[in-house]
Amino acid sequence: MKSFMVFVLIFACFSCYYAQESTNFYCGRTLSRALAVLCYGAESKRDAGWWIPQHGHHALAGVRGKRGPVDECCEKACSIQELMTYC
């Protein structure tokens, strides 16, 4: 009985690990919704305005030449952990 419980525990650990590491393609509206949910905890409403804070838009001016979430998650699959690095 104990060996069965150890097997179940090990199987559960591996299942959780591989579930976290699964990758998907996120493009367009799916990408923006995923970032909104991951970064802000909920999908923003249309009337709430642009989801980037007013002081944050200047930080995006120097992004040219760097890989962004579209490069990382739309052109190739990425994990939730990779998506969260863009929060």
Swiss-Prot record:
Chief location of this protein within or outside the cell: secreted
Proregion residues excised on maturation: 20-44, 68-87
InterPro entries in the cross-refs: Insulin-like, Insulin-like_sf, Insulin_CS, Insulin_family
Protein's UniProt keywords contain Secreted: yes
UniProt signal peptide: 1-19
Single annotated GO MF: hormone activity
Tissue expression summary: DAGWWIPQHGHHALAGVR-amide: Expressed in corpora cardiaca (CC), corpora allata (CA), antennal lobe (AL) and gnathal ganglion (GNG) (at protein level). Expression in CC and CA detected in most animals, in AL and GNG in few animals (at protein level).
UniProt subcellular location: Secreted
UniProt cross-references to SMART domains, sorted A to Z: IlGF (SM00078)
Gene3D superfamilies noted in UniProt: Insulin-like (1.10.100.10)
Similarity section: Belongs to the insulin family.
Descriptive protein name: Insulin-related peptide 1
Organism name: Agrotis ipsilon
